[in-house]
C-alpha cells in the first residue's frame, strides 16, 4: 500500500514516486504477501489455497476470472452476507463500474482503507504537473466534479460511483486541503442536483477567473458537457455577476452557501468582459479567453475519450491537454509521468503498491479478428512485460478481487526506472463507447435484431449493418449503417420515416442500463442515428478490406468501423438518415437489478 506522505510537499511526492518505480519487484511481492496473509481465511481463497499464502500456490491454484465468475459472491454480500466471503475488512461500498454484466453495471467491492489509498494516489499527480508546468502552483484548479444519484442494496450497503465515493469521503472538517487547491468549494460539488452544481461551479470559476491555473474534469466527455452548459447559460451567469445576485432557481443549500463568499457585490465590468467573449461568432479558444492565466486542461483523454481531443483543442486555444492517471473501479493503477506529451503519446506508469498486477498476453489484432486472444492464456508479472506487446491487466486487490480481468487492452511502451508504462489500446470486444457506456458486439447485435423485426410487415430485410460513434458534435451519438433489401424482386422502396425512427428507438431501448442512463438521466449521449446505404455498399466495404489483405473466406463485416477510408465508402453511399425521436427508459433500480 502507499506509504503515508504529505501531498502538499512536492519534493517528498516526487521522491516517493522515484522509490516506488525503482523497487517494483520487491513492492509487488510484498503487496501479494500482504493481501494473501490478510485474506487467506476468506471463503473464496480458502477454496483454492486451503490456507497457503505463497506466491507459487497462488499462481498455480487461484484462477484468472471475469466478473461473471465472482458475481455470486458480490451478490451474496449485496444481499447481506458478511464481507469475509472475499475480504477480511468490511466492504463499505459497492462501486458501479462503467462495465456491465448482462446489461447491468458491475458492482465492485471497496473497503474504506482502499478508498483512502485511492485518494492518496490521486494527489500524487499534482506535483508532476507542477514539475513540468511553470507557474501552475501559483493558481488554483477549476476541475468540475459531480456526485451522481446513489442507491442502497437490500441490506443497506451503499452503491455509488468512484467519483461520488471520493467526494462524499471528504468531510467538512478536512475539506481545508480541497478548498486551498480548488476554486469551487467542496460543498458545491456534493450537491445532488447536477444542474445547480454545474452552474455554481462555473459561476465560481468566472468570478475567480484570474486565479484559475488549470481547468478540466475527470473525463473529456464531462468537461465538454460543462462547456456546452456554458454556451447555453452564459447570459444568465453574466446577469448574476452584473447584479451580484444569484438566480432564484438555485435553491440547494450547499450551493447557495458555497457561492456566498464569491458573489458578494455587483461586478458589471467583469460581466461585460465575459459577455464580450461569449457573444463572439466563434467559440474557438474560449477557455483561454475566459481564463487567461490557465496553463493546461486536465482530463482523461485516452481510450474512448480520445475521440473528444479535436473538440477540446478547438475550445482550449492551444492549452496543453494533460491526461493524469489510469485506473478503473476495480483498481487505480498508473500515473502519466510526462503530462506535456502529445495526447496520442500518453502512457501510464504502473504504481506497484496499489495492488498486485499481472498481465494476460493479448494478440494485437484481437479486436478486429473477433476471436479470443489466446487458447492458452499466458499471464506474466508486472516486471516481465515486453515492450511492444499487448496485455490485459489482471488485478489482485486489498478489497477482495483475486486475479480479476479488468477488460482493458494495454500496450507496453517502455519503462520508468523499473516500472513499465503502457498506452491504452481499447476495451476487449467493445464496439461502441461515448462516455461511460460500453456496447459490446453481442449487445449491438441483439439490439439490431430486435429492431429489424419492425421491417418485416413492410417486406423489407436488413441485409447488413455496421456502426460507428459520431463525436463531431456534443454529445456524441451512435450511428448505425443499414443496407436494406426488399422481399419483392425489383421493387423500389422508400424507407418509411416513422418505421425507421421506431427502429432507432428500439435499438436504444434494447441497449444496456448504462447507455440508457446516459441518454435519459445524464444526457451525455445523443439520439441514435440510422443511415440507410445504397444496395451494394457493403460489397464495396468488403472489397476495401480484401484489398488490405483480408481473406475472403474468413471475412466478416466489422460491426464497428473507425478506418477513415472505410467510413468514406459508407458515407458516400448514404441515401437517407433517421434519428431516434424518443428517449429510452431507465430507472435508478436498474443499477443493481436484472433489467
Swiss-Prot record:
ATP binds at residues 97-98, 302, 325-330, 348, 408. GO terms for molecular function: ATP binding; glutamine binding; ligase activity. Keywords: ATP-binding, Ligase, Nucleotide-binding. Changing residue 162 to V: Increased affinity and enhanced catalytic activity leading to improved efficiency toward indole-3-butyric acid. Slightly increased affinity but normal catalytic activity leading to slightly improved efficiency toward indole-3-acetic acid. Substrate binds at residues 325, 332. Changing residue 122 to Y: Reduced affinity but enhanced catalytic activity leading to improved efficiency toward indole-3-butyric acid. Reduced affinity but increased catalytic activity leading to almost unaffected efficiency toward indole-3-acetic acid. One of its GO terms (cellular component) is cytosol. GO terms for biological process: auxin conjugate metabolic process. Pfam families: GH3, GH3_C, GH3_M. Expressed in seedlings, roots, and parts of the siliques. Signal peptide: none annotated. Its EC number is 6.3.2.-. It catalyses: (indol-3-yl)butanoate + L-cysteine + ATP = (indol-3-yl)butanoyl-L-cysteine + AMP + diphosphate + H(+); (indol-3-yl)butanoate + L-glutamine + ATP = (indol-3-yl)butanoyl-L-glutamine + AMP + diphosphate + H(+); 4-(2,4-dichlorophenoxy)butanoate + L-glutamine + ATP = 4-(2,4-dichlorophenoxy)butanoyl-L-glutamine + AMP + diphosphate + H(+). InterPro entries: GH3, GH3_C, GH3_M. Coiled coil: none annotated. Changing residue 166 to V: Strongly reduced affinity but enhanced catalytic activity leading to reduced efficiency toward indole-3-butyric acid. Disruption phenotype: No visible phenotype in normal conditions. Slight reduction in root length when grown on media containing indole-3-butyric acid (IBA). Hypersensitivity to the auxinic phenoxyalkanoic acid herbicide 4-(2,4-dichlorophenoxy)butyric acid (2,4-DB). Belongs to the IAA-amido conjugating enzyme family. Indole-3-acetic acid-amido (IAA) synthetase that catalyzes the conjugation of amino acids to auxin specifically using the auxin precursor indole-3-butyric acid (IBA) and glutamine and, possibly, cysteine as substrates. Displays high catalytic activity with the auxinic phenoxyalkanoic acid herbicides 4-(2,4-dichlorophenoxy)butyric acid (2,4-DB) and to some extent 2,4-dichlorophenoxylacetic acid (2,4-D) as substrates, thus conferring resistance to herbicides. This is Indole-3-acetic acid-amido synthetase GH3.15. The lineage of its organism: Eukaryota, Viridiplantae, Streptophyta, Embryophyta, Tracheophyta. The gene is GH3.15.
Amino acid at each position: 500500500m502507499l506509504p503515508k506522505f504529505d501531498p502538499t510537499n512536492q519534493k517528498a511526492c516526487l521522491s516517493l514516486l522515484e522509490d516506488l518505480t525503482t523497487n517494483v519487484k520487491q513492492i509487488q511481492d510484498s503487496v501479494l504477501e500482504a493481501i494473501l496473509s490478510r485474506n487467506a481465511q476468506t471463503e473464496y481463497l480458502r477454496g483454492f489455497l486451503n490456507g497457503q499464502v505463497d506466491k507459487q500456490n497462488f499462481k498455480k491454484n487461484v484462477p484468472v476470472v471475469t466478473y461473471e465468475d465472482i458475481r455470486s459472491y458480490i451478490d451474496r454480500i449485496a444481499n447481506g452476507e458478511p464481507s469475509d466471503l472475499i475480504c477480511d475488512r468490511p466492504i463499505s461500498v459497492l462501486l458501479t463500474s462503467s462495465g456491465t454484466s448482462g446489461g447491468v453495471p458491475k458492482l465492485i467491492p471497496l473497503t474504506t482503507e482502499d478508498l483512502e489509498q485511492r485518494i492518496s494516489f490521486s494527489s500524487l499527480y499534482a506535483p508532476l504537473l507542477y514539475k513540468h508546468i511553470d507557474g501552475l502552483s501559483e493558481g488554483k484548479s477549476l476541475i468540475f466534479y459531480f456526485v451522481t444519484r446513489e442507491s442502497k442494496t437490500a441490506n443497506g450497503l451503499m452503491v455509488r460511483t468512484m467519483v461520488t465515493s471520493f467526494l462524499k469521503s471528504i468531510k467538512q472538517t478536512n475539506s481545508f486541503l480541497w478548498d486551498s487547491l480548488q476554486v469551487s468549494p467542496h460543498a458545491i460539488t456534493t450537491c445532488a442536483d447536477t444542474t445547480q452544481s454545474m452552474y455554481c461551479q462555473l459561476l465560481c470559476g468566472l468570478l475567480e477567473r484570474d486565479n484559475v491555473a488549470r481547468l478540466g474534469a475527470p473525463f473529456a466527455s464531462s468537461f465538454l458537457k460543462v462547456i456546452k452548459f456554458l454556451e447555453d447559460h452564459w447570459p444568465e451567469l453574466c446577469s448574476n455577476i452584473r447584479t451580484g445576485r444569484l438566480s432564484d432557481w438555485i435553491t440547494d443549500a450547499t450551493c447557495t452557501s458555497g457561492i456566498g463568499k464569491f458573489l458578494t457585490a455587483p461586478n458589471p465590468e467583469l460581466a461585460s468582459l465575459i459577455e464580450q467573449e461569449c457573444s463572439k461568432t466563434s467559440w474557438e479558444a474560449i477557455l483561454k479567453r475566459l481564463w487567461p492565466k490557465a496553463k493546461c486542461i486536465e482530463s482523461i483523454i485516452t481510450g474512448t475519450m480520445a475521440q473528444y481531443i479535436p473538440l477540446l483543442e478547438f475550445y482550449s486555444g492551444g492549452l496543453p491537454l494533460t491526461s493524469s492517471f489510469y485506473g478503473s473501479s476495480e483498481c487505480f493503477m498508473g500515473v502519466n509521468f510526462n503530462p506535456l506529451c502529445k495526447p496520442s503519446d500518453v502512457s501510464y506508469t504502473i504504481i506497484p503498491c496499489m495492488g498486485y498486477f499481472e498481465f494476460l498476453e493479448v494478440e494485437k489484432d484481437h479486436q478486429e479478428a473477433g476471436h479470443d486472444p489466446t487458447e492458452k492464456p499466458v499471464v506474466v508479472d508486472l516486471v516481465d512485460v515486453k515492450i511492444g506487446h499487448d496485455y490485459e491487466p489482471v488485478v489482485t486487490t486489498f478489497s477482495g478481487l483475486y486475479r480479476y480481468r479488468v477488460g482493458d487492452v494495454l500496450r507496453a511502451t517502455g519503462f520508468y526506472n523499473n516500472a513499465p508504462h503502457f498506452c491504452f489500446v481499447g476495451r476487449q470486444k467493445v464496439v461502441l463507447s461515448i462516455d461511460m457506456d460500453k456496447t459490446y458486439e453481442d449487445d449491438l447485435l441483439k439490439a439490431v435484431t430486435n429492431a429489424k423485426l419492425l421491417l418485416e410487415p413492410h417486406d423489407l430485410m436488413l441485409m447488413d449493418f455496421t456502426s460507428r460513434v459520431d463525436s463531431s458534435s456534443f454529445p456524441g451519438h451512435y450511428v448505425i449503417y443499414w443496407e436494406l433489401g426488399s422481399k419483392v424482386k425489383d421493387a423500389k422502396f422508400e424507407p418509411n420515416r416513422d418505421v425507421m425512427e421506431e427502429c432507432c428507438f428500439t435499438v436504444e431501448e434494447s441497449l444496456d442500463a448504462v447507455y440508457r442512463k446516459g441518454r435519459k438521466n445524464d444526457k451525455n449521449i445523443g439520439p441514435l442515428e440510422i443511415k440507410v446505404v445504397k444496395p451494394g455498399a457493403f460489397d464495396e466495404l468488403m472489397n476495401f478490406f480484401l484489398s488490405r489483405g483480408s481473406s475472403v473466406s474468413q471475412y466478416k463485416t466489422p460491426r464497428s468501423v473507425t478506418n477513415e477510408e472505410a467510413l468514406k465508402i459508407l458515407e458516400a453511399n448514404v441515401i437517407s438518415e433517421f434519428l431516434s425521436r424518443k428517449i429510452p427508459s431507465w430507472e435508478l433500480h436498474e443499477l443493481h437489478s436484472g433489467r
